[in-house]
A protein has these predicted regions:
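An alpha-helical support segment within catalytic cores of ATP-dependent transferases
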Residues: 1, 72, 93-159, 247-251, ...
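ATP-binding pocket architecture of kinase catalytic cores
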Residues: 2-112, 151
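Active-site acidic catalytic loop and adjacent metal/ATP-binding pocket
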Residues: 7-17, 23, 142-191
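Helix-rich C-terminal or lid/interface subdomains of diverse kinases
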Residues: 11, 30, 76, 184, ...
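A general structural signal for well-ordered alpha-helical segments in protein cores
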Residues: 38, 42, 118-122, 188, ...
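Glycine-rich, phosphate-binding/catalytic loops in enzymes
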Residues: 40, 84, 175, 192-194, ...
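Short helix-capping segments at alpha-helix termini
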Residues: 47-51, 131, 213-214
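An acidic site on a long C-lobe helix of protein kinase domains
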Residues: 83-86, 187, 225-228
Length: 261
């Protein structure tokens, strides 16, 4: 995401105001609760973390809009060990935040997030699995079965930590944005792109800073494989055929690379 590419997200319309503020309005009514959660949670959570995050406030109810200070930077390329080291430390801190306090400040509880995951996995089994070529169908089915198992532990998670949500300037990480999917969930989800989708220098630095055990790494691998399935679902809904085709290509690629790991 380039610094001025503010309106490319799936969930919200995003506008830069006076070069200082970011306004976000949901594209669809069912996205509004995400922004309300951010406005409740992030002003409390932000001071506990080692990297900047937005601190949104509600500035309009019709249309519903939140505003926060602009965090300068561009999309993280996922190549720099300096960036990776900062993200590893950030995630280690995030995943030790008190979950009870987070829930009291607006975070979704673990039962809610797990139920949402299971609803999504069931939909993937119905709508995406039949679209997969035969050579990866068994791996896809096994992946969905593993994801139906509750995580061994839960923590506060960002839950959508890809390169477009990490802002960087030169070798500094200047912010972690877009917390609409956050809640109490599987910490391995935050390690999916950061340790498997990024380039090795970045990923290795994340692992060094975070120090996950093998079970967490394996769970992160499963989350990484599941990522493109969401793109297929989005395409089958409002996104259109281009997202279906791109998501299926990504799903097949990841199942072939990681499915037998």
């Amino acid at each position: 995401m380039e610094p001025d590419d503010f309106d490319g997200g799936w969930d919200n319309r995003v506008t830069l105001v006076d070069g200082r503020w970011v306004d976000r309005t949901p594209r669809f009514p069912d996205r509004e609760p995400q922004l309300r959660r951010e406005a409740a949670l992030l002003p409390w959570l932000g001071p506990l973390l080692p990297l900047p995050v937005p601190a949104p406030t509600v500035v309009s109810e019709d249309p519903f809009t939140v505003r926060h200070a602009y965090l300068p930077g561009s999309r993280c390329p996922g190549t720099s060990p300096e960036h990776g080291a900062e993200i590893g430390r950030f995630l280690r801190t995030l995943h030790t935040v008190d979950t009870g306090e987070a829930i009291r400040h607006g975070a979704r509880d673990g039962d809610t997030t797990y139920a949402e995951v299971q609803t999504t996995v069931a939909r993937m089994a119905r709508e995406v699995l039949p679209l997969l070529p035969a050579r990866v169908a068994a791996s896809g089915e096994a992946l969905l079965e593993r994801m139906a198992t509750p995580p061994p532990r839960t923590s506060v998670v960002h839950a959508d930590l890809g390169p477009e949500h990490i802002r960087v300037v030169a070798e500094r990480v200047t912010g972690v944005i877009d917390w609409g999917d956050s809640g109490i969930g599987d910490p391995a989800l935050d390690l999916a792109w950061t340790t498997l989708g990024a380039d090795r220098p970045f990923a290795d630095a994340v692992l060094l800073g975070y120090r996950p055990d093998e079970a967490l790494v394996a769970r992160a691998r499963d989350w990484h494989q599941l990522g493109p399935w969401h793109e297929v679902l989005y395409g089958l809904g409002e996104g259109g055929r281009e997202f279906v085709e791109s998501g299926l290509a990504g799903t097949v690629d990841r199942l072939e690379r990681f499915g037998s790991s």
